[in-house]
């Protein structure tokens, strides 16, 4: 009986020592990691990195969106996006108009100037970039020559779904993330 109690005591002490060693190694490893580089734009980061929520990161665009827009819901058919200087840009994607974010969709009349070489889609993006901080996303439906621009102004987290011939963009590092 005495040997069993002694064996259990030794095992408990060994387990506690092992846990302490693991904790010390973990804390040492955390201290050795270099701090993440602080950034405001992608140019502040190294090659292959993008500015995501104020830190340089090598996340894919889709993972960066999920980090930046914490409660975003993305249809499983949507497998990628593209970083632009101010937006996460999705092709063949639309906002779900039944959700809070999608209900704020309002059309904007786009008339590209004949003297400028910007497509209606680029004008739509510029409208959201130059507008107020209330622009929480833009969507373009149509082709390169003509289509409709929609602006969103609801800070609720978007629900994105597959939408043929739609392009939607969500602001990066936005105050409503």
Swiss-Prot record:
GO cellular component, one term: virion membrane
Localization per Swiss-Prot or TrEMBL: Virion membrane; Host cell membrane
Residue ranges annotated as Intravirion topological domain: 1-7
Origin species: African swine fever virus (isolate Tick/South Africa/Pretoriuskop Pr4/1996) (ASFV)
Residues annotated as transmembrane: 8-28
Name of the featured protein: Inner membrane protein p22
Virion surface-side segments: 29-177
Family stated for the protein in its record: Belongs to the asfivirus inner membrane protein p22 family.
Keywords assigned by UniProt, alphabetized: Early protein, Host cell membrane, Host membrane, Membrane, Transmembrane, Transmembrane helix, Virion
Coiled coil (UniProt feature): none
Membrane disposition: Single-pass membrane protein
Top-level lineage group: Viruses
């Amino acid at each position: 009986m005495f040997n069993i109690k002694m064996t259990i005591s030794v095992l408990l002490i060994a387990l506690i020592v092992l846990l302490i060693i693991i904790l010390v190694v973990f804390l040492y490893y955390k201290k050795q990691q270099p701090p993440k580089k602080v950034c405001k734009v992608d140019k502040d980061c190294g090659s292959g990195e993008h500015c995501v929520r104020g830190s340089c990161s090598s996340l894919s665009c889709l993972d960066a969106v999920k980090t930046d827009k914490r409660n975003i819901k993305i249809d499983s058919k949507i497998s990628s996006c593209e970083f632009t200087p101010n937006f996460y840009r999705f092709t063949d994607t639309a906002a779900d108009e039944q959700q809070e974010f999608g209900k704020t969709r309002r059309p904007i009349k786009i008339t590209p100037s004949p003297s400028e070489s910007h497509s209606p889609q680029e004008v739509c993006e510029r409208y959201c970039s130059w507008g107020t901080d209330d622009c929480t996303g833009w969507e373009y439906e149509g082709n390169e020559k003509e289509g409709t621009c929609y602006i969103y102004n609801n800070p609720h987290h978007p629900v994105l779904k597959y939408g043929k011939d739609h392009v939607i963009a969500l602001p990066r590092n936005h105050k409503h993330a």
